[in-house]
A protein has these predicted regions:
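Extended alpha-helical scaffold/tether regions of large eukaryotic proteins
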Residues: 1-326
């Protein structure tokens, strides 16, 4: 333990060394070590410096392309993943999303949420009956109803994870969103101001794409479903569609620019409301008062300590005591 303490003391006295160790550790995918270095950064007061350094390197390397900056394999996103995997981050997401996930999993059949006419199951015509224009109109009506359902679900999800900018939830910054997430959003906001980046695009890439969207695409891996609830392959399609819709909002792109069947959603009133809502509310994520920000870093440090203790292997005596209690 003394050797480990001496190592950390040596690390925290040099910000440049800390960044170097982060860079090397994140590439090697050593999660526990990355978490320990993250703790060293927060305990020494250098966490902001480390994240800003990684952000600036990505901005320079990829010429301010926000979508590339937050690519899945970047060092920046691996740093962020350390904070996204903390218990408070996972708990917050479950509290906000679980009810909406269950609605999607249990209330509707897959064909009631399908948006692609090619994938929409055709209703069989009676023997000897030829489907005419009226039949095609019926299919169009089903698609319109499906778009209404999916737009409504997306609208509820967006409001759950991102309150309106004027919402009372924002009045107490210590209670909406946990400290690791809000702290990261503030640092991203600061980097965007420094480098004149598209703030909502980068914040949306972090918060909506890296944090919220994986739970929509794979809810069973994020503790969103009760043990007795399962998702069939056909139902999985509905979750994928919802995650694609949220991705469009996060990237601020026109619906239908990638997949033509999404184009009618661009004119849907609820989708347009979601676009305005996301654009305004994402900026609120990064607006953290200095006194509130000062309270966050000790909270993050404490949670990293507890998380590391949970990752640590038990000593033989501890294991025997645990077995005896059981």
């Amino acid at each position: 333990m003394k050797d480990w303490e001496q190592f950390l003391q040596g690390v925290v006295t040099r910000k440049d060394v800390l960044v170097f160790l982060f860079r090397d550790t994140l590439r090697s995918k050593q999660d526990a070590v990355a978490k320990a270095l993250c703790l060293a950064a927060f305990s020494s007061g250098h966490a902001g410096f480390v994240l800003q350094t990684l952000l600036e390197e990505e901005v320079t390397r990829f010429e301010q392309d926000c979508n590339v900056i937050l690519r899945g394999t970047s060092l920046l996103t691996k740093w962020m993943d350390v904070l996204l995997q903390l218990p408070s981050s996972r708990t917050f997401l479950v509290e906000r999303l679980r009810r909406h996930i269950h609605v999607l999993a249990s209330r509707y059949r897959a064909d009631e949420l399908e948006l692609d006419p090619v994938r929409l199951p055709q209703r069989a015509a009676p023997p000897g009956v030829v489907v005419d224009a009226a039949g095609e109109m019926e299919e169009d009506g089903r698609l319109a109803e499906n778009r209404d359902r999916m737009a409504s679900i997306l609208h509820e999800v967006v409001k759950a994870v991102l309150p309106a900018a004027e919402s009372p939830e924002w009045q107490d910054d210590k209670h909406f969103l946990n400290a690791p997430l809000r702290w990261t959003c503030k640092e991203i906001f600061q980097c965007c101001e420094t480098h004149h980046l598209h703030t909502s695009a980068l914040l949306g890439g972090f918060y909506l794409l890296r944090y919220v969207n994986p739970a929509l695409a794979m809810p069973e891996k994020h503790n969103m479903l009760d043990p007795d609830v399962s998702i069939s392959p056909s139902d999985r399609r509905s979750f994928i569609l919802l995650s694609k819709m949220l991705q469009n909002l996060a990237n601020d792109v026109v619906f239908g620019s990638k997949e033509a069947f999404m184009a009618p959603l661009q004119e849907h009133p609820l989708i347009q409301e979601c676009q305005r809502h996301v654009s305004q509310s994402l900026l609120r994520l990064g607006a953290v008062e200095p006194d509130v920000l000062a309270l966050m870093e000790p909270q993050i440090e404490e949670e990293l300590v507890l998380s590391l203790l949970g990752d640590a292997p038990q000593e033989e005596g501890d294991r025997q005591e645990s077995v005896a209690r059981d």
